[in-house]
Amino acid sequence: MTEEISLPLSVEPIEPLIGFQVMDAWVGVGTFLVLDLATSDSRQTGKLWIYLADWAIMARGEEVRASETLPENREERLPVDELIGRHLTAATRLDDEELHLEFSQDAHLEIWENRTAYGVGAELLHIFRDGEKTVTLTFPQPSIH
């Protein structure tokens, strides 16, 4: 049985997926972004589900798709071809509110908190390994001084 844990914003749970290739990517309901990943021999799989966060996909220095610019009231799944075939090469936490995932061929995915839309302490992403949900990353609660 896989244990589900909730963590403050950290790249450690993503690191085991470094080197995996994006096999499929799409936007689901609302702004949910899903990346299906696998090793080159497809023996290990992973999934990153960007859940309650804003995001932008950058390729060669230009924004190619963003949660803020999606068509409203769409009912169909929207493919994200810009990441398919690329390998996840790094994950970086910029601060307590932003995470960057780097991909081969000069692409990256920026993920950041939107407290207005999703509230404080929202779930940033869910990580799955070999079909099992393993980790939920949450934005940390703001500290009160």
Locate each region found by the language model.
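Surface-exposed, interaction-prone regions used to assemble/regulate multi-protein complexes
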Residues: 1-145
